[in-house]
A protein has these predicted regions:
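Generic hydrophobic alpha-helical scaffold/packing signal
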Residues: 1-4, 58, 62, 112
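Oxyanion-hole/transition-state-stabilizing segment in secreted/luminal serine hydrolases
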Residues: 1-13, 17-27
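A structural signal for short secondary-structure junctions
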Residues: 6-8, 70-73, 85-86
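Conserved beta-strand termini and adjacent loop/short-helix elements that scaffold enzyme active sites
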Residues: 15, 79-81
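Short acidic/His/Gly/Ser-rich catalytic and metal-binding motifs that mark active-site loops
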Residues: 22-26, 85-90
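Substrate-gating cap/lid alpha-helix
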Residues: 24-79, 106, 123-125
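Histidine-centered active-site loop/cap adjacent to the catalytic His
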Residues: 94-127
């Protein structure tokens, strides 16, 4: 709200988390195992009530953006993180959580293609 109050017409893109196979349907925290790969810490059921998996975080972010757009904020966009780095990209998560340089490069290229396309949030319509 603070950003939007000061900049009502500025395009804002809410990007949900990219893929992390260990945390897609399990809540965190994530910690590195002995191999240096990140896994979620299993917790008793009573400690998982209300905890957020990546899938749930994406759902909630999408809902908030839809609500804000319905309330008149047409400059707010939602981008599912899998559009930038999804299931086909997991080989570029050497520790299971963080992309390597090739993964970050691909994410940047995909974001530019999305955001600066003529119909994208930062694009300029072709006259």
């Amino acid at each position: 709200d603070t950003i939007r109050d000061g900049h009502p017409d500025t395009p804002i893109v809410v990007i949900s988390p990219i893929i992390c196979p260990a945390a897609e349907d399990h809540s965190g925290p994530t910690l590195p195992n002995l191999d240096g790969r990140f896994d979620v810490v299993e917790r008793p059921d009573e400690l998982t009530v209300g905890a957020l998996s990546l899938e749930r975080i994406r759902e909630l972010l999408a809902i908030v953006v839809v609500q804000r757009r319905a309330a008149g904020d047409s400059n707010l966009q939602y981008l599912h993180g899998h559009e930038l780095f999804g299931a086909a990209d997991v080989d570029d998560l050497p520790d299971g959580l963080h992309p390597n340089s090739a993964g970050y490069q691909r994410m940047g290229e995909r974001f530019v293609s999305y955001a600066f396309a003529p119909s994208g949030p930062f694009g300029r319509p072709v006259a």
